[in-house]
């Protein structure tokens, strides 16, 4: 790993108050995306109150993927990092409400929960899987349901992807990220494994999170 790589930990409850508040509000008002409000009480009752078609008809290019200009990051819907985790019964309608308002790009990760976030997102997106772009992330190992360090060995990546595909109820992940660099595994090994998964149809593209330009160039050289 390059000396310039930063290894920011996945945030927990001791994150800054302003960021915690932002993420809490995002989970509560996710379907509205600034166009309406979803109250705590309405979420608890399984209903949403929001209006407007915030991004319908608009799009951006992300490589050869076409996505809405606003995506929905689903982390705080279940992880408890910035607010108490919520149930699939509460969050599936929020995700589907975002779809109704033109959002087509959704982000999750195996570490969110862990695992429960992908279950929620998979359930919500299953009816419209071919109409949306799905991003998820890997790169950690787990012990008794808790994050226990990083692991991006090729065998670990392959095992993680099989679990992700099952939880997300899909046969491919459109954008597959390495969540954090594993200092014990050359990034070339990661890129090579991701490239194999793309060739096998289990992923369409891969990305790297929080890496230096040097690390990014090494990965790109291995699998452009």
Where are these predicted regions, by residue range?
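Glycine-rich, proline-tolerant flexible connector loops at the mouths of alpha/beta enzymes
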Residues: 108-124
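Glycine/proline-rich, positively charged
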Residues: 144-224
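N-terminal twin-arginine translocation
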Residues: 16-21, 32-52
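N-terminal secretory signal peptides
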Residues: 1-18
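N-terminal small/glycine-rich loop or linker at the start of catalytic domains
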Residues: 63-81, 135-148, 177
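Structural preference for beta-strand elements that scaffold enzyme active sites
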Residues: 67-71, 105, 131-135, 172-175, ...
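Acidic (Asp/Glu)-rich catalytic clusters
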Residues: 64-66, 122-129, 166-169, 220-224
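N-terminal amphipathic alpha-helix/helix-capping segment at the start of soluble metabolic enzymes
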Residues: 45-73
